Amino acid sequence: MPEAPTAKTAPAYGYAPGAHAEALEFIEHVTANAGQVQRRVLGEILAQNAPAEYLRRYGIPGSPDVVDAFRRLVPLVTYEGLQPDILRIANGDTSPIFSGKPISEFLTSSGTSGGERKLMPTIADEMNRRSLLYSLLMPVMSQSVSGLDKGKAMYLLFVKAESRTPGGLAARPVLTSYYRSRQFLDRPRDPYTSYTSPDEAILCVDSYQSMYAQLLCGLVHRADVLRVGAVFASGFLRAIHFLEKHWARLCHDIRTGELDPEITDRVVRDAVGRVLRADPALADAIEDECARASWEGIIRRLWPRTKYIDVIVTGTMSQYIPTLEFYGGGLPLTCTMYASSECYFGLNLNPMCKPSDVAYTLIPTMCYYEFLPVNCNNATAEASHRDLVDLVDVKLGHEYELVVTTYSGLYRYRVGDVLRVAGFKNKAPMFSFVRRQNVALSVDSDKTDETELHAAVSGAVQHLAPFGASLVEYTSYADAATIPGHYVLFWELRAGSTAVPASVFEECCLSVEEALNSVYRQGRACDRSIGPLEIRVVAEGTFDKLMDYAISRGASINQYKAPRCVRPGPVVELLDARVQGKYFSPKCPKWSPGNKQWNKSKDLVGKGDA
């Protein structure tokens, strides 16, 4: 069968033009033969991981037909079911628990368990699969957009804080792992992977210095930029907001050819110094655009050759589409790839489609896919694995939860993404992203569910007790109108005998933040990708008005209960019209790298072995 170029020759975002046909042929082959490829992938995974303790528990190795045994015997599993074994590895156990190959590092998920990032064990070979998927992006995009090899890409990419487990393995986000890999740093010279950002700026852990250096280099290369982007829409908008605040300083650097002294990282200064030259005319041109009263269309005005904005705008990121369209001035928004910490999955074969039409084709070589119909009775993992549907057997228009078995050693793992079948590429389905299971609030990579939010609010309202006040009802929404976005809580209170000071409401804001998960707190305290949490106190009777509105729209009065999360629109307008006070968290919540659950690993392992 034809193969896409190996990771040793595949650059991060595409090939030289001569290899595009080979990449497209690879996509055509694996999608046309999706069923056969999937059977081969499952066989390879089970053969590679035959020594794994996890598979031995279910009697898979040694069975006459391991694939049949896997289908019959291995149950569905969530992260919580794997956590005792994961913590064994984190604590230094090097035995083959999940994989026949050594665990090379942990990838920290944006999803959380017990308030901490989930730790996804991975093997070194997985980096080659990720690189292969990246290598397919430009061949696909070049079918829709020509001339992308005639200039540069301004991608704003960042690393995040990482830590070491007690056993010495790195624990870091999947993109941080990729940007630090030899596959990214040693990528061959290629006209499709010419970036404005120096690697040194991307790898700078100081987010301010990294952002400043990357934007400065992007402005210096203004005339050459053909595409702009970031991973998430929220991250790209943070960059625009940063530019709004600092464009005068950036123009000064370009005018003088001298980098701002606040950029103190020597490696970054040296890298930018190789790009920056005094150019008063360029500084004047940028200044003229940035000094205008309106920033509508600023992307197209600052980078006039840009053909599209490459960011994720599916799922919760769709809330940023209007703002992106304002700044983009009509530039297409492209979604190119579907991936997670567990595994990289697929790509959008029609990347220039409207955001509402984005559908991802799952590449059958990446892992073994199964799908759990969202309407089936899946209350227990033991029963629900019998309801799983193979990749080639899903039905158009139906919704499924994604379940994966990976080379790294996840077996029938519930990713938590709900997907809808939107069409087919040959025998391989194309999926639109519907939602993340059990997520109430999200403005960046954070994911907060209703249970976590309720516990945080319940703790925070204790600050009101000395004043005789109590919480009648509350709801929340993710406000994407601010940059960065932030959580808003609407509280209706029963007043006490003493007025509650503003400082107490601010303490309530901080208390909620302190009780939220580590991904949220990192976004607030370290990455500054989330703004201060806000409490809006509404007038008495507001939630009665909200119920009246819901009933007028067809809700049952017998079954109605106040929603814990609402979306921008008429409901938020109703709530905002009755706001009596607004209060913000006065400082960032505490956060530090690492995982508090590592200290509990022995207890958890004991429970898991029982």
UniProtKB/Swiss-Prot annotation:
May catalyze the synthesis of indole-3-acetic acid (IAA)-amino acid conjugates, providing a mechanism for the plant to cope with the presence of excess auxin. Induction: By auxin. Expressed in flowers. Keywords: Ligase. Its EC number is 6.3.2.-. Pfam families: GH3, GH3_C, GH3_M. GO terms for cellular component: cytoplasm. It comes from Oryza sativa subsp. japonica (Rice). InterPro entries: GH3 (IPR004993), GH3_C (IPR055378), GH3_M (IPR055377). This is Probable indole-3-acetic acid-amido synthetase GH3.1. GO terms for biological process: response to auxin; response to light stimulus. Belongs to the IAA-amido conjugating enzyme family. GO terms for molecular function: acid-amino acid ligase activity.
